[in-house]
């Protein structure tokens, strides 16, 4: 499961065998996941939200999860959006330690103070962010199709 994007792509999930004596942390819709280790400070603790109900889904050892306990106070998608903002990415990347691999302490990350506007404003921010991300993804898809078209044309031009 990749947590490098805003939302987890459930189609990319794989299965593993879990022994009965292994303790596993079950994840739920709305949970946030953070990378604990990265090659760069800029990617350490990037987070992603699970937007779907998935049965028997457990946390892996490469990331840690966070569950918002009071959804009346903070919207999990807003928190994800906030933690991707340049202001918070800078604070989070400064918490990363290491040279070859940059690691982050879960406890240090959980000490981070975040701005929490009223719920109406949080939902507005999430809506705007989702619309922008949709537009970006649409443009990326168009660019990819144009690049494929160009590649095909170039191959046919110089046969």
Can you say where each PLM-predicted feature lies in the sequence?
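A short glycine-rich beta-alpha junction/loop motif
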Residues: 56-64, 74, 96-120
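Short, surface-exposed secondary-structure edge patches
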Residues: 21-26, 40, 54-55
């Amino acid at each position: 499961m990749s947590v490098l994007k805003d939302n987890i792509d459930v189609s990319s999930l794989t299965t593993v065998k879990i022994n009965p004596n292994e303790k596993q942390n079950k994840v739920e819709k709305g949970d946030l996941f953070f990378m604990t280790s990265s090659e760069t400070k800029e990617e350490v603790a990037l987070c992603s939200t699970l937007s779907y109900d998935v049965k028997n889904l457990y946390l892996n050892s490469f990331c840690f999860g966070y569950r918002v306990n009071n959804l009346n106070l903070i919207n999990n998608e807003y928190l994800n959006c906030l933690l991707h903002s340049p202001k918070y990415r800078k604070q989070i990347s400064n918490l990363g330690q290491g040279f070859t691999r940059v690691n982050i302490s879960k406890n240090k990350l959980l000490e981070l103070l975040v701005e929490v506007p009223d719920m109406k404003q949080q939902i507005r921010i999430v809506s705007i962010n989702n619309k922008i991300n949709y537009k970006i993804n649409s443009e990326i898809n168009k660019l990819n199709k144009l690049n494929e078209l160009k590649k095909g044309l170039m191959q046919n031009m110089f046969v």
